[in-house]
UniProtKB/Swiss-Prot annotation:
Stretches with biased composition (Polar residues): 90-100
Biased composition (Pro residues): 116-134
Record field: compositional bias (Low complexity): 143-158
Compositionally biased residues, Basic residues: 27-43, 50-78
The protein, known as: Uncharacterized protein C45G9.4
Highest taxon of the lineage: Eukaryota
Amino acid sequence: MTTAITPDKKKLVSPKPTKTTSDKSKTKPRRSSKTSKKRKSKKGLFGCCAKKRKTKRSKKSAKRTKRSAPKKAPKKAPMKAPSKPAAIPQQAQASLQKPIQSGIVDADAKAKTVVPRPPTPIPPTGVKPEPAPRSEPLYQPRSVSSTTPRTSATTGTTEQMVTAPATLPPPSAESKHLPQDPPGDASSPRVQRQYTAEKYSKEDQDDDDQKDLRKSVAYPSHKFFMTQYVKDECRVRRWVYEDSVPLMMESNMKHMLRMASNRIAACQSDKATRCDMMKDLNEMTEILDGNF
């Protein structure tokens, strides 16, 4: 028997729990994006020695250098036929020929319009031709005037005096081409004078140099020393050569003796200084006795 479900009977549905603040939503962990490598199972045919075979292959396989391909010669460009000149159209040829033809026509017209010269008259056979007139010179000197009066007595004996013309003729073309002396010619007296002056000045300078050289050899500089002496209550200094005796040495010594006597008179009480000064005086007297 079948029992019919009455509409009064409803299905009991459990109510959904409401979310509260205390409840926390648990998130699922993210899966890694990297795909996990699946290991091949070593099971199967020759699975046990697959690893060994791999290592053997890696040892055997060595890097082989690739052979470079042979260099091919660059292909030569095919020989091109010489380019033919571009054909000029007939209209352009006609326009080019027009001015040429017009120029030829103008030249022919000018040649035709040349005026013929009149024929030269031929003299008759019996008549001689007249000589050409003589060309007079451009320069005509004045009439020569004589300073002495011409008399009947002197006409036969005295000659006519020639005077210089007042105006000179213009220089001819031949005189322009004559060789002229250059401005710096050696034959001119001024240049010769200058050359001789330079020559003598050089010679004098050479002589002076030779004299200085001889002096420097005869009197070397290290043998000169400076001396000083007193003249008219003034100190005089002079360079003296060691071999020569100065002329004013006597006056210098006299001055030194005078100064020494004054010092001795000043230090009469001091016996030690007086003895030292006396020794110096004795040395000076010995020097004077040896030189003079």
